[in-house]
Amino acid sequence: MATSILGEEPRFGTTPLAMLAATCNKIGNTSPLTTLPESSAFAKGGFHPWKRSSSSCNLGSSLSGFAVATGGRGSGSLAGGSGAANSAFCLASTSPTSSAFSSDYGGLFSNSAAAAAAAAGVSPQEAGGQSAFISKVHTTAADGLYPRVGMAHPYESWYKSGFHSTLAAGEVTNGAASSWWDVHSSPGSWLEVQNPAGGLQSSLHSGAPQASLHSQLGTYNPDFSSLTHSAFSSTGLGSSAAAASHLLSTSQHLLAQDGFKPVLPSYSDSSAAVAAAAASAMISGAAAAAAGGSSARSARRYSGRATCDCPNCQEAERLGPAGASLRRKGLHSCHIPGCGKVYGKTSHLKAHLRWHTGERPFVCNWLFCGKRFTRSDELQRHLRTHTGEKRFACPVCNKRFMRSDHLSKHIKTHNGGGGGKKGSDSDTDASNLETPRSESPDLILHDSGVSAARAAAAAAAAAAAAAAAASAGGKEAATGPNDS
């Protein structure tokens, strides 16, 4: 194998990885570079990694060797193929780490490669050739030409701490490796929250949860161990099922230690005591509010009467117990000099005061209207002009009107008043004027009786005038022929 590696001309394939391995072989070789084969060799042969002259290696055997070295189930499949399957190309494909990594673990490469070759039925001479080729691949010249090959592997520290066969399990747990992936027994990261109680934190790291984690992750150990054994057996990074389970358990330990620690201390005894105290305070406050509910309602009712600032309420407040008679009357007068209007409710007084201040808080929300009014009943009456509603109906002719004053004018026409007919059928809104007084049905009937009496008197006067005129005409007719 060593003779074929050093002295035989390589046959190039079409993949970049094959070209890379061949170029590295040429760099380490002391003989002058050989010329490339004809273009027909690329079309005929396909990919043949350094096959012997005595035996022919097809594409399937080389690919099977590559699959075993990267993700196979075990090293036992190496014995089923030819010696070319366990080739230097497989070693180069499974060791993309830096030259520093290979120099640190140079002795381990040769030992583990010899052990893997013995397990697969390969002679020690071939294993020595493999180690010689590894020393050729990881050189400073290769780092200069191909910087990606010489770049430090992003998971180099992970390989060292998790899969190296010479590291003890205690070194990983004690924090011997100084990488971000390692799990330490006492991490000092920013995610950690110190708990003064300590009892809850110690329960997380006890032996029972760790045992349960190992039992839960036991189903993943066979697949994981076979994967790591086949992938890293030729590079000296092979590990057993115990190391794989230890890696999984430490990752779960990281989740339990750093992920859930900031959440769990919030449920400590001190916070629970604070929550219980707050709950008891709320319950006691609710009980006190329920006990003094009637007194609070009475106090609100009494204080509501004292909120009015009219002269009558201020006088009753000043007099104290002597002003009880003023409070019983419940009269609220306007404080504007010269007004003197009195109302029985504070809301009516407030509505009246808007006339003095010019405040108009009630706005018509009809489209493109936007008129403002002082009182809500004015706004409701104005809205009837938009909707066309006529609430007031005539009892005689059943004619309907929007406003009560319009109805009263219309009733006068039925009683023979005549003078109030002008504008009686007008439905125009006078909302910009002061609100008219509300007319009761008794007042409407009284007005109609007065108008009827006036009409009767007018009719009697007209009849008397007609009788007088008739009598005067008769006298003239009687004296006329005598004069002639």
From Swiss-Prot:
Disulfide-bonded cysteines: none
PROSITE patterns given in the database record: ZINC_FINGER_C2H2_1, ZINC_FINGER_C2H2_2
Keywords attached to this entry: DNA-binding, Metal-binding, Nucleus, Phosphoprotein, Repeat, Transcription, Transcription regulation, Zinc, Zinc-finger
Zinc finger annotations (C2H2-type) as residue ranges: 332-356, 362-386, 392-414
One GO-annotated biological process of the protein: embryonic limb morphogenesis
Free-text domain note: The 9aaTAD motif is a transactivation domain present in a large number of yeast and animal transcription factors. In SP9, the motif is inactive.
Family label: Belongs to the Sp1 C2H2-type zinc-finger protein family.
Main subcellular location of this protein, as a coarse class: nucleus
Span(s) of short sequence motif 9aaTAD: 178-186
Keyword Cell wall biogenesis/degradation included in the entry's annotation: no
Region: Disordered, residue numbers: 409-446
Pfam families on file: zf-C2H2
Keyword DNA-binding: yes
Origin superkingdom: Eukaryota
Function: Transcription factor which plays a key role in limb development. Positively regulates FGF8 expression in the apical ectodermal ridge (AER) and contributes to limb outgrowth in embryos.
Subcellular location: Nucleus
A GO molecular function held by the record: zinc ion binding
Phosphoserine modified-residue sites: 440
Single GO cellular component term: nucleus
Protein name: Transcription factor Sp9
